[in-house]
Curated annotation (Swiss-Prot):
Domain of life: Eukaryota
Chain positions of motif Cx2C motif 2: 213-216
GO MF annotation, one: metal ion binding
Keyword Chloroplast part of the UniProt annotation: no
Signal sequence annotation: none
Cofactor: [2Fe-2S] cluster; [4Fe-4S] cluster
Disulfide bonds: none
The family this protein is said to belong to: Belongs to the anamorsin family.
Name of the molecule in the record: Anamorsin homolog
Function: Component of the cytosolic iron-sulfur (Fe-S) protein assembly (CIA) machinery. Required for the maturation of extramitochondrial Fe-S proteins. Part of an electron transfer chain functioning in an early step of cytosolic Fe-S biogenesis, facilitating the de novo assembly of a [4Fe-4S] cluster on the cytosolic Fe-S scaffold complex. Electrons are transferred from NADPH via a FAD- and FMN-containing diflavin oxidoreductase.
Length: 238
């Protein structure tokens, strides 16, 4: 078995099993660390003396979940460019678990072992060129405005729009669920008209001067129908 023979040449060899027999030829190899249970393999990550010291590893774990955990552990303690072989009856699962742990699968034998290598590429540092912004590259915000942008809007332009028909000959009316502000505008106009209309205290303003009180705002005006709009002159006659 050439793969195994190559591994046995390295003194920093780690072998993890799930309690089964060891691979033939690993007994008595100088520098070989044998972990006979997966529970002990979990403690490898905390062993400062072992982290980064393993060059080769042999994994003999058949249970899928335990195999994934062992592969992760071996990857953490292994040196860069270190190699691992997994003896498993399910070659597809062994390849997948190695790749998930971070290994690159390099060889799949016709028998049981799957071979992988630890390659960690941190990439190259790239200097960021933020550049220098010159004053001439700055945009004058006032230069983006047109002449009409400086004109004061008229009252009609400030009025709310959006409700009613677009026919210019028809006055727009606020819709039932008005949200454009036209309903509030109509309400304010209505309140202004009510406030502008003179209040009658005696109720006889429309009957004529003979029935009006001395402070009636309609003194001097001809009789009119109740509810009829009457314009009152605010200029005194001299």
């Amino acid at each position: 078995m050439s793969i195994l023979s190559d591994f046995l040449k390295h003194p920093n060899l780690l072998q993890v099993t799930d309690g089964g027999p060891l691979v033939d030829g690993t007994n008595g190899v100088k520098g070989t660390r044998v972990v006979g249970s997966v529970s002990n393999a979990r403690e490898l990550r905390g062993a400062d003396s072992l982290v980064g010291d393993v060059e080769r590893a042999i994994i003999q774990v058949q249970e899928t979940e335990l195999l994934a955990e062992v592969c992760n552990t071996v990857f953490d303690v292994m040196k860069q460019n270190g190699e691992v072989i997994v003896f498993s009856q399910d070659l597809t699962t062994a390849q997948r678990k190695l790749r998930i742990a971070g290994f690159r699968v390099t060889e799949v034998a016709a028998e049981f072992p799957v071979r992988g290598i630890k390659l960690v590429n941190f990439g190259e540092k790239v200097a960021l060129d933020l550049g220098v912004v010159a004053d001439e590259d700055l945009i004058d915000e006032d230069g983006l405005l047109q002449e009409e942008d400086f004109e004061k809007p008229t009252g009609d332009q400030l009025k709310a729009g959006g409700c009613g028909p677009d026919d210019p000959n028809k006055k727009k009316r606020a819709c039932k669920n008005c949200s454009c502000g036209l309903a509030e505008q109509e309400e304010l106009e209505k309140m202004g008209q009510i406030a502008a209309e003179p209040k009658s205290s005696c109720g006889n303003c429309s009957l004529g001067d003979a029935f009006r009180c001395s402070t009636c705002p309609y003194l001097g005006q001809p009789p009119f129908k109740p509810g009829e709009t009457v314009k009152i002159s605010t200029v005194d006659d001299f």
